[in-house]
């Protein structure tokens, strides 16, 4: 029986990538800086002390981080009791966004530029907004700028409730984000609007990676908070991903947990399981691992690391999340059988100590555990697509166009 359990720790970078200078991210190090702050006692909100992640250490995260940066994370040394193969990978896609990272992991790097809305104010063209307004029968939009999602609902949420005008905003990523109140605007209305925006962007050749529904609740700016009902309406993959190949060539199953299905536009997904919150995502993953059949990929994205702690520059929260995940990792490891593969990786960085609120261009860990495979140093992988190619070889699928088998 062959099964792959692929877990993406969203934004868990382990040191700036070789091309980080193109993104002004030289020196960024999501994992290393979290470890440093914990060691120095500067990440003690809701937790305390040095970062405690024994299971990640056992899978090789410390050694992988050292190979990526040339030095061990502060307070750690070489770990000799590693049970997994470990290495690190750099991205060849043009962007440092979720879609690019995940597609490249699945064997389809995004080599051309996305459409970005670069103006800090009046970010979306009026001609585009007018098309959306006409088709959606809205009275207008508010926002239309670069913004942090939590900041903009605090600033414009009350006006949105009064006017019923959706809040639209973007970032340095290729995204069109729409924030609306779940009760006063309606969750179904928000999803419908996002589908309309996705249709118009595609029709008029705006190569925007994601339209993101950002629902929130609360009665005033002191109470507004985003809910777990976020949805991503992604552009469809340009080529066949390894998850689609598994379904097409082996009639296999791909179980998508969290926002994975949205990232691939539902393409190459057999079953989509909605799950929110780090603990619940881990529980759902464990549940699906226990019942996974032959030729199955259980594919989980742990979004909280990125959305709750990375973008919000919350070092303590990120550290606490890593410790929570590590506490669930022992059970995950115990469920991996002789012919299974457990793969832990990330899609980009989001250093909570870095300037601004955006992603960081970083190398990502590649940790592969299987009781039936001899542990090995995987080296510096020149593309995330090596993961997709490895999965393709493992399931005896036709070759992917990018990447090399690591095993």
Curated annotation (Swiss-Prot):
EC number annotated for this UniProt entry: 5.4.2.7
Binding positions (Mn(2+) 2): 306, 311, 359
Record field: transmembrane: none
The protein's annotated pathway: Carbohydrate degradation; 2-deoxy-D-ribose 1-phosphate degradation; D-glyceraldehyde 3-phosphate and acetaldehyde from 2-deoxy-alpha-D-ribose 1-phosphate: step 1/2
Main location: cytoplasm
Cofactor binding note from Swiss-Prot or TrEMBL: Binds 2 manganese ions.
Binding site for Mn(2+) 1: 10, 347-348
Single GO cellular component term: cytosol
Family annotation (InterPro entries): Alkaline_phosphatase_core_sf, DeoB, Metalloenzyme, Phosphopentomutase_DeoB_cap_sf
EC class of the enzyme, as a word: isomerase
CDD domains: PPM
One of the record's GO molecular function terms: magnesium ion binding
Names of required cofactors: Mn(2+)
Catalytic activity field: 2-deoxy-alpha-D-ribose 1-phosphate = 2-deoxy-D-ribose 5-phosphate; alpha-D-ribose 1-phosphate = D-ribose 5-phosphate
Keyword Metal-binding listed: yes
GO BP, sorted A to Z: 2-deoxyribose 1-phosphate catabolic process; 5-phosphoribose 1-diphosphate biosynthetic process; metabolic compound salvage; nucleotide metabolic process
Compartment(s) where it occurs, according to its Swiss-Prot or TrEMBL record: Cytoplasm
UniProt key word Disulfide bond: no
Annotated function: Isomerase that catalyzes the conversion of deoxy-ribose 1-phosphate (dRib-1-P) and ribose 1-phosphate (Rib-1-P) to deoxy-ribose 5-phosphate (dRib-5-P) and ribose 5-phosphate (Rib-5-P), respectively.
Family classification: Belongs to the phosphopentomutase family.
Protein's name according to its UniProt entry: Phosphopentomutase
